[in-house]
Amino acid sequence: MQLKRVAEAKLPTPWGDFLMVGFEELATGHDHVALVYGDISEHTPVLARVHSECLTGDALFSLRCDCGFQLEAALTQIAEEGRGILLYHRQEGRNIGLLNKIRAYALQDQGYDTVEANHQLGFAADERDFTLCADMFKLLGVNEVRLLTNNPKKVEILTEAGINIVERVPLIVGRNPNNEHYLDTKAEKMGHLLNK
């Protein structure tokens, strides 16, 4: 286990009241959060989203990505379902960090795509570690998930880490003129399952 569960509190939101559960990485002290809605203790698969931190999309309403749109759509779907989990995976910019993400944006403004920009900065296309999320699910007592994602790699890694993904639920929202090239690149170079 790479994490420990350290704190929890009620979090009222526009979608209803969630239980916010805080986790701490044992090796680094980095924190991550789960938002739990309703009773997840039933022995049926739980609707869940692994959402990687995106300050620009989630909090600053950037149209360069689909992250903020996905966050809102996932919370809406979880609330409508009556139970579910959103794991807020604190690995900003596919885990290159906020400042490098800004540098990558500058390279994209010069014509590089999102993958090329990461490579120009010395990073892989995706530096995230989703095994941490498998540990969060396990600490929440969840083993079977209906995963809200367009990323087949996320499904593969969580499955290899012991989480039974019984269904991949598409989450295709937020396409606009500012992020079309970004989304097309994610589909073409990173294998994301995105329909235009």
From Swiss-Prot:
GO CC terms of this entry: cytosol
Positions with a binding annotation for Zn(2+): 54, 65, 67
Pathway: Cofactor biosynthesis; riboflavin biosynthesis; 5-amino-6-(D-ribitylamino)uracil from GTP: step 1/4
Gene3D superfamilies in the cross-refs: GTP cyclohydrolase II
Cofactor entry: Zn(2+)
EC number: 3.5.4.25
The entry's keywords: GTP-binding, Hydrolase, Metal-binding, Nucleotide-binding, Riboflavin biosynthesis, Zinc
InterPro entries: GTP_cyclohydro_II, RibA, RibA-like_sf
Regions that span the bilayer: none
EC class (word): hydrolase
Active site: 126, 128
Entry's cofactor comment: Binds 1 zinc ion per subunit.
Record-level Gene Ontology MF annotations: GTP binding; GTP cyclohydrolase II activity; zinc ion binding
Function field: Catalyzes the conversion of GTP to 2,5-diamino-6-ribosylamino-4(3H)-pyrimidinone 5'-phosphate (DARP), formate and pyrophosphate.
UniProt record similarity statement: Belongs to the GTP cyclohydrolase II family.
Assembly: Homodimer.
Name by which UniProt lists this protein: GTP cyclohydrolase-2
Lineage: Bacteria, Pseudomonadati, Pseudomonadota, Gammaproteobacteria, Enterobacterales
